[in-house]
A protein has these predicted regions:
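Predominantly soluble domains enriched in secretory-pathway, periplasmic, or organellar proteins
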Residues: 63-431
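Generic detector of short, well-ordered, non-transmembrane alpha-helical segments enriched
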Residues: 4-7, 61, 314
Length: 431
């Protein structure tokens, strides 16, 4: 496991610091020890020696006892560059790929599976295939045998998506990664016949499709317009939008006004790296990549990928509540089921942040084995988080598994290249 990898330089620095602290501590207590009876003196010195050795060699007891799972946790993950769906099984024996399913129908080009959603009854799952000729598609699968049950064509580069509470409607953002910087849309798909029943125009490069817990509002963000967009699920129309740029925050009713796209595209709109580009000097844009409603639906948390912060928007007042500092390239978000902690993948920082929502304080920054972080999902019992890491070039993708009590990675498993969308299936008896 990568947590055991420590550089020699870092270890020497740690030892030097501990040595200085230890010597200072010894100097301060030596005079007191001389006044103690011999038996107490020896006992105290032994205790101090054991503590020093534990610190020096990293064997100090953990503050939280770590235990292996006694059941199997099943997670689906997509590999965008390999047209593969993998089912990950994590249990008492560790983490492994249970099986893989090929997806797509283009014999030469990559179809690019990007987003995944699973029905609440755990009978079906849906996968968006972002690439197309030119339009992408969404496919419906059975969780029993991974059989394709239906498909439908959507817009340009369909990406993240979410399901209504009853599973009848699927909300898919048409990200339009490689197209003109024009307003794109959210497709609404009836899942029984697999038919697109609405295409709702929003703004440029929508991403991060999420419904509130009540199922009454859908939220997405637009990377190129710095906006959070709310859709009323009863009318299937944009009800409000919110400008997220720091110093220019503004909540407005109705849909955004479409910008004119005459003339050549602006140079700063190159999004080939999709969240990997650091901001240029003077750039104050948010470049949002995810919208995550709270467990009560009273707040929406937005990942600002360029300004490296998480913006909390009050759903009732439609105003900014606070800006939480984040790591470079904060990308996808997830909230624990008890509503107390927010998890963030940091695409440019090669790490995952665990944030206490009440205080906004980062409890842990957890490095990952490979670069280019993508998605994160929390198990229903709030015990583990599963993180997809794309990797670079020919590297395999990775699923890293975090123990949320110990705040450390406890398992890692390789999957095909460019691990992207990730979703939790179920917990079942261990095999």
């Amino acid at each position: 496991m990568f947590l055991k990898r420590r550089s020699t330089k870092g270890h020497e620095l740690t030892r030097n610091v501990v040595s200085e602290v230890w010597c200072d501590f010894v100097d301060r207590v030596s005079s007191r020890l001389r006044q103690q009876p011999h038996r107490e003196c020896v006992s105290l010195w032994l205790t101090m020696l054991l503590l020093a050795l534990a610190i020096l060699f990293g064997v100090a007891p953990a503050t939280v006892a770590q235990s292996k799972p006694d059941k199997d946790y099943l997670v689906y993950v997509l590999s965008e560059a390999a047209d593969t769906i993998s089912l990950i099984r994590f249990g008492p024996g560790g983490a492994r790929v249970d099986h893989e399913v090929p997806t797509g129908d283009m014999p030469i080009d990559i179809d690019g599976p990007h987003g995944i959603a699973i029905s609440r009854d755990q009978e079906f799952y849906y996968v968006s295939l972002a690439h197309g000729r030119p339009f992408g598609t969404v496919w419906k699968y059975s969780t029993k045998d991974d059989r394709v049950l239906g498909r439908t064509t959507l817009g340009l580069f369909p990406a993240t998506m979410d399901l209504s509470r009853d599973g009848s409607l699927l909300y898919v953002v048409n990200f339009n990664l490689h197209g003109d910087m024009a307003p794109s849309s959210v497709s609404v798909v009836a899942t029984e016949p697999m038919l697109e029943v609405a295409r709702i125009q929003t703004c440029a490069m929508p991403h991060g499709s999420r419904l509130n817990p009540q199922g009454t509002r859908h939220y997405s963000v637009c990377m190129m317009d710095d906006m959070l967009v709310e859709i009323d699920t009863a009318t299937l129309k944009v009800s409000r939008h919110f400008l997220l740029t720091k110093g220019r925050e503004m909540g407005m009713s109705g849909p955004p006004v479409a910008k004119k796209t005459d003339g050549p595209p602006a140079k700063h709109l190159d999004m080939g790296g999709h969240g990997m580009e650091p901001p240029k000097p003077g750039d104050i844009s948010c470049s949002p990549t995810w919208a995550q409603p709270s467990t009560s639906g009273s707040s929406i948390f937005v990942a600002c990928n360029k300004s490296d912060e998480i913006v909390e928007v009050d759903a009732a007042k439609w105003s900014v509540t606070r800006r939480i500092p984040a790591r470079p390239g904060v990308y996808n978000l997830a909230i624990t089921k008890d509503g107390t902690h927010l998890l963030a993948t940091n695409k440019r920082d090669q790490s995952v942040s665990i944030i206490e929502l009440k205080s906004g304080r980062e409890l842990a920054r957890i490095p990952t084995r490979r670069k280019v972080l993508h998605g994160v999902v929390v198990s229903p019992d709030d015990r583990y988080a599963f993180v997809s890491v794309e990797g670079v070039g020919s590297e395999p993708g990775t699923v890293e598994i975090i123990d949320l009590a110990a705040l450390k990675i406890v398992a890692s498993v390789d999957v095909p290249e460019e691990a992207a969308g990730i979703e939790f299936l179920r917990i079942e008896p261990a095999k």
